[in-house]
Design a protein with these regions (language model features):
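Secreted/extracellular small peptides and ectodomain modules produced from precursors
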Residues: 10, 19-21, 85
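N-terminal secretory signal peptides that target proteins for export/translocation
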Residues: 1-14
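Exported/periplasmic ABC-transporter solute-binding proteins
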Residues: 35-61, 65-68, 72-82, 89-92, ...
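Short N-terminal or domain-adjacent regulatory/targeting segments
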Residues: 13, 25, 124-127
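Bacterial N-terminal signal peptides
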Residues: 16-29
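Sec/Tat signal peptide C-region and signal peptidase I cleavage site
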Residues: 30-34
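Beta-strand-connecting loop/turn residues
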Residues: 14-15, 115
């Protein structure tokens, strides 16, 4: 007859094996349920993205790593191998280039927001008639984003061309690498006014300073598109993020930050 300690050993073996199997299964399930997605996002969408991420992570368990910058610079980084799964641009042009270069997944490109451009000064009563203010130039510096790399900068150039002030204002223009830097120029008073995203002013304090909502007829619509990159093609978290951007929750958040439309109204 076996000794008592031998019986205990034989009884424990099946239990230990079962427990080990459960641990393996739980580990496998956890790995498939939660993943990570890396996204490159246009600078104007920084605050909106951070709120979207909070909701997405709470709903799905997936984790999001976000990098922010000008659309042009993010595009260049992606073409040079930056490890992004999703590209969220502030224009249509660069996502189209990604698609044409077969660096993105066909059929995934869509417009997630339409931006609005404003002329803003943190000083109260800085101007009453914005076009006249720009013509008279009672300021030392006017901030815009770099038109070559930032869609909001290109829109600002279009506005100034529309009112005939692009060339006259050249000596006073200070250009930010991104719309985020442009906004900082104005907030820090390094520029007395600037063309920025309406969403930035809304987050800062939409009742502070002086604001001109630029008529849409003065610049091409700032349709902001996202595309799933090849790196994220088989990433469940990346595809979940793309789906989330089209959800009612995301559209509501996007609109609350001052963007005209979400996915359902544009597509």
């Amino acid at each position: 007859m076996p000794e008592p300690h031998e019986r205990r050993t034989r009884i424990c073996h099946p239990i230990t094996r079962a427990f080990a199997c459960l641990c393996v299964l739980f580990s496998f399930a956890s790995g498939t349920m939660a993943g990570e997605v890396s996204i490159g996002v246009a600078a104007n969408f920084t605050d909106t993205t951070r709120e979207l991420i909070r909701h997405f992570e709470a709903e799905t368990g997936h984790q999001v790593s976000a990098s922010f910058g000008s659309t042009g610079k993010l595009y260049a980084q992606i073409r040079n191998g930056a490890p992004f799964d999703v590209f969220m641009a502030a224009d249509v042009f660069r996502p189209e280039l990604i698609e044409e270069a077969q660096a993105g997944v066909n059929g995934t490109r869509f417009t997630y927001a339409r931006g609005k451009l404003v002329l803003w000064s943190p000083a109260p009563d800085a101007f009453e008639d914005a076009p006249r203010y720009l013509e008279q130039q009672p300021f030392a510096r006017l901030a815009i984003a770099n038109p070559k790399t930032a869609p909001y900068g290109l829109a600002a150039q279009q506005v100034l061309e529309h009112i005939g002030q692009w060339q006259p204002l050249q000596p006073k223009l200070v250009r930010g690498d991104s719309i985020a830097q442009t906004f900082q120029f104005v907030v820090s008073r390094n520029a007395q006014a600037g063309f920025v995203a309406a969403s930035q002013v809304k987050v800062w304090d939409e009742d502070a300073g002086t604001l001109w909502q630029v008529p849409q007829a003065y610049y091409q619509p700032i349709d902001q598109q996202a595309i799933l990159l090849n790196r994220g093609a088989s990433n469940e978290a990346a595809r979940a993020w793309m789906d989330f951007l089209k959800s009612d929750t995301a559209i509501g958040i996007i609109r609350s930050y001052g963007y005209d439309q979400g996915h359902d109204a544009i597509n």
